[in-house]
């Protein structure tokens, strides 16, 4: 088994999670972090890719494998386990290894190697952009679709463009205030600025306006061939007019037209955030489990 550094210019093998895309690693590096992207090869053939994030807490070094690896579709179970077995020894120094597998099936690959679950799996919402617009509309739940139609008839206009840090910093401030009020966590504004600085065209900002007033927005991060919902905000008027229903519909159609295969809408928590969960499910997103957060207890 050969494990070697992989150039950021090499595209991912599939529509991977944001955390396994080379842009994510580049942004972490810009923020002073360490991310290493690796190719896994067996008998001269690429079988997978993986991005590892290294973090230090005083003397403790942690290597974290988020939402990966990304495998060639025809790579067998034995080869996958073999690659994961060789991964820690291929990296410099000693570290505590953590993993957040992308699926329960991937989690099963880690267990024979001494990994044990720390937390129960989370669920994520993924919107498939490959069906036709009419098919995506039909996949929406009835109440969601009715709110979309009311928003379409409200006079709201949706505009789309790349995120501009100088022009749009006030939007980040509005979303940050919303976070504090609703007590939810998200990546800091510094991450948004670093992403926009690293890849200015890899953002897509959708603004809903009533006449000249912005009443809601959503910001997507682009990591072809997938995109990820990053942050959003809605004021009282935007909520009354179901502006986020209209924005998400426009965003899905826009991204599909640009060749994106999937829009990741983030975690689904039916207990902690039931309203947001209903919004994602009602939009027609597919809900699936990730693997649990895992720690390597033995080499």
Language model segments and positions:
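Active-site/acyl-donor-binding loops of N-acyltransferases
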Residues: 1-7, 54-57, 110-135, 257-299
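A short, internal acetyl-CoA/4′-phosphopantetheine-binding micro-motif in the GNAT/acyltransferase core
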Residues: 66-76, 130-131, 231-241, 269
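Non-catalytic accessory segments adjacent to catalytic cores
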Residues: 78-121
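Aromatic (often tryptophan-rich) hydrophobic motifs at membrane interfaces
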Residues: 81-89, 192-195, 200-299
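A structural signal for short, well-ordered beta-strand segments and their strand-loop junctions
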Residues: 95-100, 159-160, 207, 262-264
């Amino acid at each position: 088994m050969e494990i070697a550094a992989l150039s950021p210019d090499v595209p991912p093998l599939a529509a991977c999670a944001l955390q396994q895309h080379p842009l994510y690693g580049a942004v972490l590096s810009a923020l002073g972090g360490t991310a290493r992207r690796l190719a896994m090869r067996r008998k001269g053939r690429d079988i997978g890719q993986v991005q590892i994030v290294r973090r230090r807490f005083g003397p403790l070094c942690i290597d974290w494998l988020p939402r990966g690896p990304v495998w060639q579709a025809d790579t067998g179970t034995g080869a996958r386990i073999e690659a994961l077995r060789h991964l820690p020894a291929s990296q410099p120094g000693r570290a505590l290894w953590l993993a957040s597998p992308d699926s329960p099936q991937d989690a099963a690959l880690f267990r024979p190697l001494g990994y044990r679950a720390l937390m129960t799996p989370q669920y994520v919402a993924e919107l498939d952009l490959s069906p036709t617009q009419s098919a995506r509309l039909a996949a929406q739940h009835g109440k969601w679709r009715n709110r979309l139609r009311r928003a379409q008839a409200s006079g709201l206009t949706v505009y789309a463009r790349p995120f501009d840090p100088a022009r749009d910093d006030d939007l980040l401030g509005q979303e940050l205030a919303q976070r504090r009020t609703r007590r939810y966590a998200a990546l800091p504004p510094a991450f948004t600025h670093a992403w926009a600085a690293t890849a200015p065209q890899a953002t897509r900002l959708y603004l809903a306006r009533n006449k000249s007033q912005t009443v809601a927005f959503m910001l997507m991060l682009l990591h072809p061939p997938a995109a990820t919902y990053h942050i959003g905000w809605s004021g009282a008027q935007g909520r009354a007019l179901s502006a986020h229903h209209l924005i998400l519909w426009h965003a899905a159609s826009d991204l599909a037209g640009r060749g994106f295969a999937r829009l990741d809408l983030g975690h689904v928590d039916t207990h902690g955030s039931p309203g947001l969960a209903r919004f994602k499910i009602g939009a027609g997103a597919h809900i699936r489990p990730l693997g649990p957060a895992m720690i390597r207890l033995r080499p």
